[in-house]
A protein has these predicted regions:
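Short beta-strand scaffold positions
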Residues: 16-17, 148, 175
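Short, structured coil segments at secondary-structure junctions
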Residues: 9, 29-31, 117
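Short phosphate-binding loop-to-helix
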Residues: 14, 20-70, 78-82, 86
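N-terminal glycine-rich phosphate-binding loop and ensuing alpha1 helix
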Residues: 1-16
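Hydrophobic helical membrane-anchoring modules
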Residues: 166, 170-197
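Conserved core of the sugar-phosphate nucleotidyltransferase
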Residues: 47-50, 68, 77-169
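Short, high-confidence coil segments that cap the C-terminus of an alpha-helix
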Residues: 10, 64-66, 93-96, 191
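Short beta-strand/turn micro-motifs composed of small residues
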Residues: 17-18, 73, 102
Length: 197
């Protein structure tokens, strides 16, 4: 919420949740919660796009112009306003329909191993085994921090091209457990003390 507000990109910062307590906390930090999310969209199996599309459908009539939507995950504590600004500018300059926050894999995925039932390792892609890691193509992953969407993604585009905004690795943490949260706190402190940005 803080990064979104500080970015000055958004007319409104809206939180989609099915939980009254979360709604209350979101409001206390300056977000709006004009509706509670339908329970059918609040399980562990519903994809992000369905949730964002639902929010877009509910909000589009209350805006004079709702051209771009940004979904920011609640589990992105190291996200800064400048990342949102840079990603939005990238989207505008590239005339893209969508921007995904990405980060480079820390190791070449072409040299990944798989284990069989006995624990024996084999290369997932053996043809890359003899190659130097610096000669392999860089690969990126969706780092699950934020997504920008043009409104056409919700209204009529079934297939749209996305471009990636590469986040610094020290700003990317996937928070699923209390240990992940502790790691995020330690990383935030390190980023601040070492002035990594």
């Amino acid at each position: 919420i803080k990064a979104a507000l500080e970015s000055k990109l958004f007319d409104k910062v809206v939180v989609s949740t099915d939980d009254e307590k979360i709604a209350s906390v979101a409001k206390s930090f300056g977000a709006e919660v004009p509706f509670l999310r339908d329970k059918s969209l609040a399980d562990d199996f519903t994809g992000t796009f369905a949730v964002v599309k639902d929010a877009y459908q509910k909000l589009k009539d209350s805006f004079s112009s709702l051209d771009t939507v940004c979904c920011i995950y609640a589990t992105a504590p190291l996200l800064k306003a400048k990342h949102l600004q840079e990603a939005y500018n990238l989207m505008q300059n590239a005339h893209a329909k969508s921007v995904i926050s990405i980060c480079e894999f820390p190791f070449p995925i072409q040299r990944a191993f798989v284990k069989d039932d006995n624990g024996n390792l084999s290369y997932r892609e053996p043809k890359f085994a003899p190659m130097r890691s610096q000669d392999l193509q860089k690969c990126y992953q969706d780092c699950g921090l934020f997504y920008f969407y043009d409104k056409s993604c919700f209204e009529y585009a079934k297939d749209y091209q996305s471009i990636g905004y590469a986040m610094p690795r020290h700003r990317v943490i996937d928070i699923d457990t209390p240990e992940d949260w502790d790691y995020a706190c330690a990383m935030a402190k390190a980023v601040e003390e070492l002035k990594l940005d």
